[in-house]
Structures are given as C-alpha cells and as structure tokens.
Amino acid sequence: MVATPDDPRAQTIVDLFNGQGSAPAPFDVLTSALSFPTRDQEQWWRKTGPMFGQMLASSGYTLDQQYRHLTFYYNQLVPRLGPHPATFHSSLTVSGLPMEFSINYQQKGAHPMVRIGAEPIDSFSGTERDPFNQIPPAEMVNHFSRAGVKGFDPELYAYFEPKHSLTREQQARLPKEVPGGDKLKTQYAFGFDFKGDEVSLKGYSYPGLKATMAGQEVAKLVGDGVKDLKNQGKLDCTEAWAAVEAYMTELNGWGYHNLWAWDYVSPAKSRLKFYSFVMDVVDKTKLEELWTLNGRATSPAHQEGLRHLKELWDIIDLKNVGKRDLPADAPQIPEDAAPMVWNYEMTAGNPLPFGKGYFPLQGLNDAGCIQKLVKFFELMGWKDLAAKYPETIQSFYPGLDLSKTSHLLMWVSYTYSEKTGVYLSIYNHPCPEK
C-alpha cells in the first residue's frame, strides 16, 4: 500500500524529484510513502528496517538495489514476522526473534553481501493450532512458487518436508524428552541472500529432532534421503556424504541438534549442508580435524583455507574469552570451553565436503569483538574494510555504546573455496532492544 496523491506523506517524494532538500536514506523515503495493514508489521519495519537499509548502503549496493531489496523486505518478509513483540521463540536465532541479519565478506568478491535468516511466523504459531509453526513456512514456499522469483524451485522442500516434520504425537513428547525442548519448536526456516539485483533462497530443516523423536538414527534418516536423490537422478552427493557420515560417527556428532540445509534451486544445482555442534574445540589440532574431517578432505583449497582458519582461531581466541554476559535463561557456556557449530557443504560431482565453522560471539563485549575482526581484516589485507568497520557497525546501532554491550555481534562463520577464497560472515542482532 502506498500514499495517495492527497496524502501529505507523498510530498516527500515530490520534493525529492524536484531536487528540494537533501536526499534521505531509501528506508526513510519508503517509510514516508508506505502504509501498513497492522501495527505489528509497522513495528517490525520501524525496528529492523533502518538497520537492513544501512547494511545495504554500507555494503556497496546501488541506490536502485537498496530500494529493490528494502521493498522486498517490506512486501515479502515483514508481513511474515508475526506479532510484535515476538510471541514465538524461534530456534533459528540466538535471540529467539524470527530473523537475523548478516553480512558476508569474500576474499574474491566484488563487495559484501547482505543476508537475512528468517522463520515465517503468524499469530497462531506456538499455539495449540500450530504448536511447532509448520503452516507459515509451507505457505511461504507456496507463495514464492507462484511469485515468479527468478530461479526459485521448491522441489527439495517438497522432498524433505514429509521426512523431517514432527507428527503431533512427537511434538507433544518433545518438551519432556529433549533438553530445552520447550524452546525447540522451529521446523523450517529460510535464508535470503541479496546478490546484486537478485534474491536467492536457502531452506533449513531439523532432521535431528525428527530422528530423535521417531527413534531413528540421524545418519540413516539423512543418508537415506541423500541416496534416494541419487537414485532418482536428481542430485548425487553420496560420496561427499559418506565422508561426512564417517566423520560424524567418529566425532559422535549425531543428535537432536543436527540441522540440514539446501538451496531453493533445481536439485542438480543445489548444495546440501549438514550441521553439528561441538561443545569444546580444545585446540588447533581439533580445529584441523574438524576442518579436514579427520584427514578426509585435504585438497590444496582445504589446506589454504586451513591456514587462514588457524589465523582467525588465534585472533578470536575462544579458549580465553572469560565469562560471557549471557541472559539468565540462556544456555551458559563454561569459561574454559570453546564451543562451535560446524556445517559440511556437499555439491554434486565433488567427492570432498567443505566445512564451515561458526565462532559464537554472543555474551562477549561487542567493541572487543569488533577489534578482533578488524585485526583479521588487516591480516587478510582488507585495509579499507578494517579502517571503516568500527564506524560501520556503530551505524547499525546508533545511540548505543558498543563498549558496554555484549549481544549485538552473534556469530562469525568461516569457510573457504577456490572460487571465493576466504568466505567470512558476521551475524548481527536485528533488534537490540529485544
């Protein structure tokens, strides 16, 4: 919905086209012209939209692209974020909010890429009518299937959804049988990558929960799907999966925490990703084991990636961060532990998976984390980024003293490939007053 010609808000647009006044940010222009069908949507837009807009601007998107992606956010995501304040705890994010923002930096990329992770929510999510929020994700898939989003293909969602979804009986048992199960009610989520003019989508599911509640082995549930996709002639990642499966068994990495991910493209072009959690990465020897799947993935690209990963490990220094400032109701991390999330990416025709490590920053002083990231940027030779980064992050959170906060930077993830070189993503809290 837009402002009508006699609406005083429309004057802002007229002034801009007439060259009067200084040009406001795209978010402000849109806000002056748009209207909202509900107060919830208006609140999500006003609370999170400025940061998304600033991320786009600071990452080098053209003015046209900023308007394009902000409009996408307004039209496609804001209406699907549910009540404000949030009433459903999403297990996709550390904050429990239905979305998180991140920026990806690539050694061989043109400019940073802004991303959003989101779980669509509505007012019934978490209630007895839809306790595990299964309906809004399905509706979002159906919507994008009809919306003409370039390259969007729902086939893998249609394949995995019936295999990874909890039944109502399993949903009823989960809070009692899984630690923290009362907050583990996310079934499906989405990732949005804003690449130039386009938006690409990723999907996430929770086969670990399904296998646990169904009395199955996670390895069999996921592995059977990988093999079946090959047998159907749609996607062959069986060799890479065999390496992941063998290493997860050695690591004892199976459990209710396992996530799964794919791309919303034709299956043959999709990546598959398997996620696990390691409570304590004790040293760089363990780090190397995780990166190479205990010697199973040692290509030249893996070795070069390992070199930079060790540099990042030394700088972040998870083993010596001290006590984290975490909410009382959040899982508490022992001071001497170095927990990490890992995923392993598999693609058709490549027998070697590539790992990605996630360093948790939540509970650590934000200004201190920023300085560590600046140090890594300098080590990589990213001088302009290093010089501007503190100011850039401050622009996301105007009015906050980042030397006194510890919840704005959530994660930094690292991977490497021949195509991208170092591939670093930093995850930010989208609504810090939460």
Curated annotation (Swiss-Prot):
Q: Where is the signal peptide?
A: none
Reactions the enzyme catalyzes: L-tryptophan + dimethylallyl diphosphate = 4-(3-methylbut-2-enyl)-L-tryptophan + diphosphate
Q: Tell me its EC number(s), please.
A: 2.5.1.34
Q: Does the keyword Transferase apply?
A: yes
Q: What single Pfam family name could you report for this chain, choosing any that match?
A: Trp_DMAT
Q: Which keywords appear in this protein's UniProt record, sorted alphabetically?
A: Transferase
Annotated substrate binding sites: R115, K202, Y204, R271, K273, Y275, Y358, Y423, Y427
Q: Which GO terms describe its molecular function?
A: tryptophan dimethylallyltransferase activity
- Please give the start and end residues of each transmembrane region: none
* Residue positions binding L-tryptophan: S91, L92, E100, Y206
Provide the function of this protein: Nonribosomal peptide synthase involved in the synthesis of nidulanin A and derived compounds. Nidulanin A is a tetracyclopeptide with the sequence L-Phe-L-Kyn-L-Val-D-Val and an isoprene unit N-linked to the amino group of L-kynurenine. The NRPS nlsA is responsible of the synthesis of the cyclopeptide and the prenyltransferase nptA adds the isoprene unit on the L-kynurenine residue of nidulanin A. Further modifications lead to additional oxygenated related compounds.
Share what the entry says about its subunit structure, partners included: Homodimer.
* PANTHER family for the chain: INDOLE PRENYLTRANSFERASE TDIB-RELATED, PRENYLTRANSFERASE ASQH2-RELATED
Which protein are we looking at?
Answer: Tryptophan dimethylallyltransferase nptA
Q: Which organism is it from?
A: Emericella nidulans (strain FGSC A4 / ATCC 38163 / CBS 112.46 / NRRL 194 / M139) (Aspergillus nidulans)
Its taxonomic placement starts with: Eukaryota, Fungi, Dikarya, Ascomycota, Pezizomycotina
